[in-house]
From Swiss-Prot:
Residues binding substrate: 33-37, 45, 49, 77-79, 81, 83, 200, 206-208
Species in which this protein is naturally found: Listeria monocytogenes serotype 4b (strain F2365)
Required cofactor names: Mg(2+)
Protein known as: Isoprenyl transferase
Listed GO CC annotations: cytosol
Active site (UniProt): 32, 80 (proton acceptor)
Cofactor note (record): Binds 2 magnesium ions per subunit.
Superkingdom classification of source: Bacteria
SUPFAM superfamilies membership: Undecaprenyl diphosphate synthase (SSF64005)
Amino acid sequence: MFKKLFRQDENILNSELAEDLPIPRHVAIIMDGNGRWAKKRFLPRIAGHKEGMDVVKRVTRYANAIGIDVLTLYAFSTENWKRPTDEVDFLMKLPVEFFDSFVPELIEENVRVNVMGYRENLPNHTMRAVEKAIADTAHCTGLTLNFALNYGGRSEIITAAKEAMKELELEGKSADDLTEEKLNDHLMSSGLGDPDLLIRTSGELRLSNFMLWQLAYSEFYFTDTHWPDFSKEDFLQAIIEYQNRSRRFGGL
C-alpha cells in the first residue's frame, strides 16, 4: 500500500517538472501558520498542529517522489517553550503519534529519520520516540527526513564554535586555525549539506533563528499559504520557482 502512495505522487509530480533543470538536493521548510489556520476556523491551536502533521507526511512523499536527498523541517524552536503549557505539551506528544504511524511507511520507502536540536531538554516520551525512529530507519539510504526539534540557529553556531575550538586545542592549534570547514563539521546538520531551497509558509518574511549559517546562499521561497493548507501544487510551485532561478553564490 505504501509503495502505491509514493508511486502515485512520483508520476504526478515528475510530469510537472522540467527534466533539464536541477532539482534542489536539500529543501528546508519553516512550517508556519498552524495556529492562524486553526483560529480562522474557530478551532484550538492544537487542531492546526494536528492537521500540520498530516501535511508533513504528504510533503515527505512529494520530496521523495522527485528525488530530493534531504528534507529538513523546522518542528520546534528553542523559543517555542515560551508558548502556553498545554500547546507545548501537545507538541511534545506529536512525535510519538507521528513516528508510530509513519515509520513503517518510511522504512518501506527507504527514508531515514534524523533529528537535530538539543535533545537533552526534551521530555522522556518525546526522546524515546525520536531515538526509536532514528534507530528503526538507520539502515535506510534514500531521502533523509531531518527534523529541527528544540533547535536554535544562534545556539547551534555557538555550540559548534566551542566544540571546534576544543578540537583545535587538542591538536595544539589556535583560534587562527579555525576555518569555515572546521566549524561546519561541528554543526548539527554536518553531513547533510546546506539547503538549496528554503520554503516558509504563512506569509512571514523572516528566518526565525533557523539554520542561520547554512542558509547563506540558499534560495528563499515565501508563500501566504498556511502550513495545513500547503498542497501538492504549492510544493510544485516552490520547486518550479527554484528551477527557474540562477544561483550565483556571490559571483556573476
